[in-house]
């Protein structure tokens, strides 16, 4: 039998989820640090969506070791179908007969992960902050859950979850901890940790972490969890704003449904800023900047509790429905309109960078992408975030903010617990405003096809530049050197926020005029940029220096690349370093590639060497 992609809507799954839907998963895993694998079983409850027409279930798997399969307690025949890159090896489970519409069956699969698992990263004690214990964590978005257990690995299917996880070290999962349920350590020193996720979630939100983890409160319904030696500084960074953010977004949408909102600060090799795993946001330590200036990551991941986690894109081709909405909500949380526009200006720079990286005609620069045969990770960029945000911002301006504010809770109520695509979004907003002649006319006259399918940049909004004008002016002064009489002073940036310094450095980076190596070095010395504790600032300064040809930033750049695995910083730094000193870039990558998460490592390899088949 050949392997086929079973549409309806998601081209990135091989499962036949149009015939069967998983409604509950019980995941029983033993975390084996010495073997770097998970071992156990998963029990799926499947509901039939046909009337006896399907006598087999096909699940996504990738590099898994399957032991046995039982259907309703009885051993079942199963086989692997031919592998299909990049989606893995489908698991076909045979049933004696079809099942009536809406009836359920239970499928129990014994499974172990393998060394080729793309979802898990295993850290040695040396890779953690206090160097005492090993650590593991998962990252399942976009299609990596299938490398932990057989599943319908698509955002178009959601189910409830129970986790029963045994480990010698504390465990975090994307469910509510069943408080007081952990048993006393067994003779082998392991403890059973239980979690329950009562809200149906898609497979990409399945999450596990285990290591030397302690917790501290950061709000009435929130804790931060991290390495004990970092707990105090993480608590300080997050305790002032977390509950404020929750209250603010509840006023915009509706009350938080997940019970607790907690944050796990991961070791530095985590490849993203944050991952919106329910109950426990997984976050990069790069947000701990000791100035509370980088917690917009927390605002973003919290907003995912509504957009993405409750209301979900049906496939990764419509990823903007997750990330555009989340970016829009995040920017509604903080500091009023001038700051919202300021944040959007930073986002516009990220959007132009992504369009430049792919090329203005590339399919990945469209709001709706074509991912047939593609790995969704290859399309990952700021485009769904920022093009999505700008589309929603355009709709807000089109109908008026007060009217759009009435649409927001309607939309999130209509699709609560469901997945949707862009066409359903369009029909929903058109229907909501059908009795408002002004809004309805404006929405019906909108060129939806251009927004959905045109590559490249969208129309640029008329942003309020009040918070960026001062840094635009400072950038112009630097770029006027050495011809002008401008004399840089430390006072130039005193009183600016770190995010304003970020915009200043971005202006230098995008200018057609380049700084000389001497001026770039002078900037770092006068403003103390290379020594900044804020990695958003330091990494951009290193990019400025590399672009200017300042050899003095090569060493600190290589040093930083061995300390952080967040792709937002790692990928552009490697690209800039490779242009300036390719050998040093390759040597640095060779030295640190074992430190990076598999997703990050694969993307940097593509940046440095091109695709493997090229």
UniProtKB/Swiss-Prot annotation:
It is found in: Cytoplasm; Nucleus. Its main location: cytoplasm. It catalyses: an epoxide + H2O = an ethanediol. A peptide binds at residues 139-141, 271-276. Its EC number is 3.4.11.-, 3.3.2.10. GO terms for molecular function: aminopeptidase activity; epoxide hydrolase activity; metallopeptidase activity; zinc ion binding. The active site is at residues 301, 385. Zn(2+) binds at residues 300, 304, 323. It comes from the Eukaryota. Its cofactor is Zn(2+). The keyword Cell membrane does not apply. Binds 1 zinc ion per subunit. PROSITE patterns: ZINC_PROTEASE (PS00142). One of its GO terms (biological process) is protein catabolic process. Keywords: Cytoplasm, Hydrolase, Metal-binding, Metalloprotease, Nucleus, Protease, Zinc. GO terms for cellular component: cytosol; fungal-type vacuole lumen; multivesicular body; nucleus; NVT complex. Pfam families: Leuk-A4-hydro_C (PF09127), Peptidase_M1 (PF01433), Peptidase_M1_N (PF17900). InterPro entries: Aminopeptidase_N-like_N (IPR045357), Aminopeptidase_N-like_N_sf (IPR042097), ARM-type_fold (IPR016024), LTA4H (IPR012777), LTA4H_cat (IPR049980), M1_LTA-4_hydro/amino_C_sf (IPR038502), M1_LTA4H (IPR034015), Peptidase_M1 (IPR001930). Belongs to the peptidase M1 family. Aminopeptidase that preferentially cleaves di- and tripeptides. Also has low epoxide hydrolase activity (in vitro). Can hydrolyze the epoxide leukotriene LTA(4) but it forms preferentially 5,6-dihydroxy-7,9,11,14-eicosatetraenoic acid rather than the cytokine leukotriene B(4) as the product compared to the homologous mammalian enzyme (in vitro). This is Leucine aminopeptidase 2. It comes from Aspergillus fumigatus (strain ATCC MYA-4609 / CBS 101355 / FGSC A1100 / Af293) (Neosartorya fumigata).
